[in-house]
Amino acid sequence: MTSPLAIYRIQFRPSFGFVDAARLVPYLHGLGISHLYASPVFQARACSEHGYDITDPNSLNRQLGTEAEFRELVGMLHAHGMGLILDIVPNHQAASTQNPAWRSVLEHGPASPFAAWFDIDWGADPDGKLRLPVLGAPVDEILERDELRLDIDEGSGPHLRYFDTRYPLSSASWALLLEAPAGASRPALVAAMVAGLREATPEAALRVESDLVRAYRDDEHVRAYIDVALDHFAPGTTGARARLRDLLALQHYRLLYWRTGVETINYRRFFDISDLAGVRQEDPRVFDE
């Protein structure tokens, strides 16, 4: 490893990726630059303009280019006797449902295999929930305006949707959601899966949920049943808001009005940015995983 003599920082973004940086190497070498200091290159939130809101620290950011293009950049630097300094952002990640680790924590709470990654004080909430200051108004107003809805797609199954954000459901709430509506006969496959979800580990629950999503896509009887169950939570349906409140009570997170929620937040943030969650970098196991 050579000691840096002259460093030039580059800011990656969707409009400036690995190929663009590689083209600059000969020019920067001619200026006497010894090292590039690069902004984060790992997978970040969609359309991130800075890359510090990392969602997967084990994958390159697809918006910046391919692995082959990244290797070409590194090869170009080496060919010119230059080095690369990477900002790996070890101290925080995106508190976003686009982040699989954070999403797992939302779905499974302290039982998530990723719960130890983040500095969360579960005991600070009376019900042991992760407190999320993400709503544009108190939750009762949000429910009255029908802005929080239960939705489903063929890729990820049922979820709570607040505008463009989708929040995962706990295994216990899947069971509530899929209880047989009045007059409906629950398919045996759904009944078996619901039973499997009640006491499942996060890993087992993920498999059951994947099977259920596949059945929703491929089995017309399962699809029809789940659609009827979802209709009981739809805006305008009698008792729908009360059912949504019951569903919210079963989650491992508490959705809060952002103006007041920040006063009782129970996870460490990056400075005062609520959508960047602090990573427990003092624990080597976080980086081993």
Q: Where is each model-derived feature located?
A:
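Alpha-amylase-like alpha-glycosidases and glucanotransferases acting on alpha-linked glucans and related
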Residues: 1-5, 9-15, 47-53, 58-85, ...
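Catalytic domains of carbohydrate-active enzymes, especially glycoside hydrolases
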Residues: 21-45, 69, 289
